[in-house]
Amino acid sequence: MTRSDPLPSTGKRHPIFARVFARAGPAMDAQGALEHRRALLAGLAGRVLEVGAGNGLNFAHYPPAVTELLAVEPEPYLRALAETAAQQAAIPIHVVDGTADALPSPDAGMDAAVASLVLCSVPDQARALAELRRVLRPGGELRFFEHVRADTSGLARAQRLADVIWPTLVGGCHTSRDTLTAITNAGFQLISTRRFRFPDSRLPPPASPHVLGIARRPPEPGPEGRHRID
């Protein structure tokens, strides 16, 4: 289910990359991304925000306990595909134009937020994470599936070299961002992480190191200094 949003366009356009990304999704799922996507979303409930929803590949995998999904996507071609995907989903989905650095949600309005292959490409990662923390209620979860800086020196060096040209070719994507450190620096508590390479090949491409994880906006102190989870 979906509703359209009359907000003015953000003007974020990557027409060539958007079409390549949309066509690559099913192939990536066949290679194993589908398993990671399902793990990313398992157990979510309540009101959820997905930033950089792309063409809506995640929509079919949200559990029925999700009562509303606010799907934010700035690229017009991908957003149109997401609206179509939302119409076929089993949960209520509101697809909107918007960017990670100014999320269209009130403070503490979400039970969870999802970032799937998006923190690599936001212009200001710290600001995007601050926005995600803002929209989460205390105790709310940030679910993330991202490609990140390698934990081996050789591949990390290759990533830094690749990033000279990679963002221009791949919709602003960076291969060498230390996203886990950025998440903790934004005030989140890391709950769980799993690092892996995808695709897992003998000669790994720069964007192959990935992390799948859960972080939490810390709960607010209770009346007597104890922590309360709403």
Regions found by a protein language model. Give the residues of each.
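Class I SAM-dependent methyltransferase SAM/SAH-binding core
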Residues: L49-A102
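A short glycine-rich, Lys/Arg-flanked "PGG" loop and its adjoining helix->strand segment in the class I
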Residues: A126-E141
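Conserved class I S-adenosyl-L-methionine
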Residues: R143-I165, V170
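A short SAM/SAH-binding and catalytic strip from SAM-dependent methyltransferases
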Residues: D111-D124
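Conserved alpha-helix/loop element of class I SAM-dependent methyltransferases that forms part
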Residues: A24-R47, L57-H61
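A short acidic, Gly/Pro-enriched loop at the edge of an enzyme's catalytic core
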Residues: D101-A113
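Core SAM-dependent methyltransferase catalytic element
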Residues: R194-D230
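Short alpha-helix
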Residues: G172-G187
